[in-house]
C-alpha cells in the first residue's frame, strides 16, 4: 500500500496531501456513504488516488481512525462551548 498522504500542519491539523482539506472531512464524507469519486468531485483539490489510500487506511485501521474522529469531534465541541461561553449575548437573539 502506498504511504498515507497525510501531513500535519502548523496548527496540528491532519490534512490530506498538499491540500487544506482535513483528514476528518474525507473520512466523514466516506462514512456518510460517498464513494471516493464523489469526494473528489466535491473537493477538486484532492487526487482520487489519495482519497483511495485514505479510505483503504481507514478500512484497515477502523478502530484507530474512529477514535481519531471521536477526538476531533470532542475538540470541536469543546471549542464551540468555549466560544459560546465567552461571546454569548442574548441581545443578538432578539
For every predicted segment, state its role.
Residues 1-16:
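Short, Lys/Arg-enriched N-terminal segment that forms or immediately precedes the first helix
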Residues 21-91:
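Long, charge-rich, low-complexity alpha-helical segments
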Amino acid at each position: 500500500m502506498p504511504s498515507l498522504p497525510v501531513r500535519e500542519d502548523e496548527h496540528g491539523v491532519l490534512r490530506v496531501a498538499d491540500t487544506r482539506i482535513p483528514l476528518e472531512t474525507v473520512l466523514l464524507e466516506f462514512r456518510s456513504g460517498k464513494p471516493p469519486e464523489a469526494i473528489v468531485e466535491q473537493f477538486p483539490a484532492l487526487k482520487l488516488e489519495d482519497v483511495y489510500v485514505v479510505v483503504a487506511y481507514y478500512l484497515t485501521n477502523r478502530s484507530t481512525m474512529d477514535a481519531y474522529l471521536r477526538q476531533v469531534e470532542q475538540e470541536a465541541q469543546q471549542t464551540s462551548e468555549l466560544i459560546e461561553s465567552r461571546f454569548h449575548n442574548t441581545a443578538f437573539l432578539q
